[in-house]
UniProtKB/Swiss-Prot annotation:
Annotated metabolic or biological route of this protein: Xenobiotic degradation; atrazine degradation
GO BP, one annotated term: atrazine catabolic process
Oligomeric form and interacting partners: Heterotetramer consisting of 2 AtzE and 2 AtzG subunits.
Organism: Pseudomonas sp. (strain ADP)
High-level lineage: Bacteria, Pseudomonadati, Pseudomonadota, Gammaproteobacteria, Pseudomonadales
S-S pairs: none
Protein name according to UniProt: 1-carboxybiuret hydrolase subunit AtzG
Amino acid sequence: MTETEIFAYIEAASIAIGIPLEPARARAVAHHFSRTALLAEMLESVPLSPESELAEIYRPAPFPAEDI
């Protein structure tokens, strides 16, 4: 997204959720949004093997049987 598109998105989103933003505040939010998008892009570029992926559901291994 370009800076203009991000700013337009921030303005539209603030109206949609009912949060009034002055233009200066909207520009600050757009700046932080751009930085967050850049960080996400950097994370997405790191290759992951299937072993690196998080499991959808955590299921701990059962405890070993104890001899009583």
